Every structure is written in C-alpha cells, then in structure tokens.
From Swiss-Prot:
InterPro entries: LuxS_sf (IPR037005), Metalloenz_LuxS/M16 (IPR011249), S-ribosylhomocysteinase (IPR003815). Pfam families: LuxS. It catalyses: S-(5-deoxy-D-ribos-5-yl)-L-homocysteine = (S)-4,5-dihydroxypentane-2,3-dione + L-homocysteine. This is S-ribosylhomocysteine lyase. It comes from Staphylococcus aureus (strain bovine RF122 / ET3-1).
Length: 156
C-alpha cells in the first residue's frame, strides 16, 4: 500500500477493534508547542456507524463539555465515516488523562438535558439532532471503558 498524506488512510481499518482511543499523530509547531491528535473510535470500521442525528448531538455535547475538563483542547471533530471523532490537545501528552477527560465528557452527555447550540443561528443542520441518540452512543462507549486502550483487540 502506498503511503498517503492522511494518517488514517495508512491505518489498516480491518485490524482495529472498536471501541478504542489511540494517538493518531503529533505535530510540533515552530515555537515548540506540540499538538496531539487522538482517534476516538466508537464503532467498528466498515461494520457499524453512528446514525447522524445522534452523532451530531454527540458532537455538540462533547465539543462544548470537553473544554470544561481541559484547557488544552484544540478541536473535537467527527469522522466523515461516522465511526468516531478526532480530538486534538496542545502540549498534553498524558494518554491516561486523555481517557479520563473523554470519560468525564461522556458522563456529561449522559446528564445533559438539552443539546447545546441546537438552533438555526448556531448550527448548520439544526433539524438533525437526537439527545437520546447521543446518550445511547455515549453509554455504549462508556460501558466498554476497560477496552479503550486496546486498539487491536489483543487484550493488552
């Protein structure tokens, strides 16, 4: 397979076992700051996906709430394949802490009573949301918290 510019295109998606959180890449800036990009994989690639209303609400809830748990978050974005999200941190390389931040954020999702910015002024597709769908996705991921570190399903 020819090496491609996009890191995830070089990942053999048939070898990973969701759910997991993995360091997908790092980038150092000119002043020494380092961006750490994590792959938060909720669903098994090419086997499952998150339905759009639940995924969309989960994106809003996570993007808003994750920043309550870390001031190092640069961005949280959904994957187009609808199997997960990317989250990027600046100058924060503690993998176990990232797992704890994601866990706390997903617990916020479970406790949410509304989806933030779920209106036509603040959202580009305000009609496509499901708070209950987001909670279902979050709960399923939290239920497998002990598997998040095991990207390839080796049990290690």
């Amino acid at each position: 397979m020819t090496k491609m510019n996009v890191e995830s295109f070089n990942l053999d998606h048939t070898k990973v076992v969701a759910p997991f959180i993995r360091l997908a890449g790092t980038m150092e800036g000119l002043n020494g700051d380092v961006i750490y990009k994590y792959d938060i994989r909720f669903k098994q690639p090419n086997k499952e996906h998150m339905d759009m209303p639940g995924l969309h609400s989960l994106e809003h809830l996570m993007a808003e709430n994750i920043r309550n748990h870390s001031d190092k978050v640069v961005d949280l974005s959904p994957m187009g394949c609808q199997t997960g999200f990317y989250v990027s941190f600046i100058n924060h390389d503690n993998y176990d802490d990232v797992l704890n931040i994601v866990e706390a954020t997903l617990n916020d999702v479970l406790n949410a009573t509304e989806v933030p910015a779920c209106n036509e002024v603040q959202c580009g597709w305000a009609a496509s949301h499901s708070l209950e769908g987001a909670k279902t996705i979050a709960q399923a991921f939290l239920d497998k918290r002990n598997e998040w570190h095991d990207v390839f399903g080796t049990g290690k």
